[in-house]
Regions:
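Conserved PLP-anchoring active-site segment centered on the Schiff-base-forming lysine
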Residues: 95-113
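Short conserved active-site loop signatures built around small residues
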Residues: 1-29
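Alpha-helix C-terminal capping segments
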Residues: 72-73, 91-99
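Conserved N-terminal alpha-helix of the aminotransferase class I/II PLP-enzyme fold
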Residues: 33, 38-87, 112-120
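Active-site catalytic pocket residues across diverse enzymes, especially alpha/beta-hydrolases
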Residues: 96, 120-121
């Protein structure tokens, strides 16, 4: 896929995971929780010992497909999709800053960004 043009990668990124209803395109999984065969399987998923989806705020098939598709299209090493502006801002700031770091900013920021900087970092 790397040899294809950007447009070809966008249009031809395959849907490789068949769902139980044989959908031709990736279905939207609008659920919060997932069923497990046993308590041990559930524990393994929540502890990250498997790639199973455990809870949609952590991951779900739709978001994983989107991240994989963006990674394939762009050639990025990894992609993290977030579902709100504040999630994107807080994740970015936590990746580049640390507690006690000096950050110069205005009070006029998106949502609770100023409060996040003041009280969390």
């Amino acid at each position: 896929m790397e040899d294809f043009s950007f447009e070809a990668r966008v249009l031809n990124t395959p849907y490789e995971k068949a769902d139980v209803y044989h959908s031709l395109s990736m279905p939207v999984y609008n659920t919060a929780a997932y069923e497990f065969d046993s308590a041990e399987d559930m524990e393994a998923a929540f502890c990250g010992r498997t790639t199973d989806h455990a809870y949609s705020r952590i991951t779900n098939p739709t978001v994983q497909y989107f991240e994989d598709r963006i990674r394939m299209i762009t050639g990025a090493m990894g992609v993290t999709a977030l579902n709100s502006g504040m999630a994107a801002i807080s994740n970015t700031l936590m990746a580049i800053a640390y507690s006690g770091a000096n950050i110069v900013t205005s009070r006029h920021l998106f949502g609770n960004t100023y409060s996040f900087l003041l009280n969390t970092l």
